[in-house]
């Protein structure tokens, strides 16, 4: 579901605290999230560089909102599930905790060991096999678990 022009304008107005038609570039991630997008930290840093100024206007927000590389949580969920399914040759719906830890700390928008430790406190790891349901993991991440890279 896309945000309407009115919703984008309303969002911009909320972040434009002094009504000067400008919003701090530091708020770009929060703006996009409030409009239903889910930019990664890397996305946000790239957008800040692209904007190239300390502030942005409504037209910049509209342009950025339309970018296809800024995913919704549902799009991110599908992509993550597809990636885990590709790794799951046996089709069990699980990944070993040690393998997951390795992936999360070394690939893509990787996480710190401390962030992975926090995540592991939130997910269920089978005490017998050490396996993690990747569907449950993805739901935890997409539902708003505050990880820097996601």
Curated annotation (Swiss-Prot):
Pfam families: EF-hand_6, EF-hand_7. It comes from the Eukaryota. Ca(2+) binds at residues 16, 18, 20, 22, 27. One of its GO terms (biological process) is myosin filament assembly. This is Myosin, essential light chain. The gene is mlcE. The lineage of its organism: Eukaryota, Amoebozoa, Evosea, Eumycetozoa, Dictyostelia. SUPFAM superfamilies: EF-hand. GO terms for molecular function: calcium ion binding; cytoskeletal motor activator activity; microfilament motor activity; myosin heavy chain binding. Myosin is a hexamer of 2 heavy chains and 4 light chains (two regulatory light chains and two essential light chains).
């Amino acid at each position: 579901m896309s945000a309407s022009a009115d919703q984008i304008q309303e969002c911009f107005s909320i972040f434009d605290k002094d009504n000067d038609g400008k919003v701090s570039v530091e708020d770009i991630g929060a703006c996009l999230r409030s409009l239903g997008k889910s930019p990664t930290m890397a996305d946000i840093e790239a957008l800040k560089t692209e904007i190239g100024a300390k502030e942005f206007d409504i037209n910049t927000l509209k342009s950025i909102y339309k970018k296809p590389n800024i995913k919704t949580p549902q799009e991110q969920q599908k992509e993550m599930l597809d990636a885990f399914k590709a790794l799951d040759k046996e089709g069990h719906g699980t990944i070993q905790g040690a393998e997951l830890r390795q992936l999360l700390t070394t690939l893509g928008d990787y996480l710190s060991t401390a962030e992975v430790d926090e995540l592991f406190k939130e997910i269920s790891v089978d005490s017998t096999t050490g396996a993690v349901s990747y569907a449950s993991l993805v739901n935890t991440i997409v539902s708003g678990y505050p990880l820097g890279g996601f």
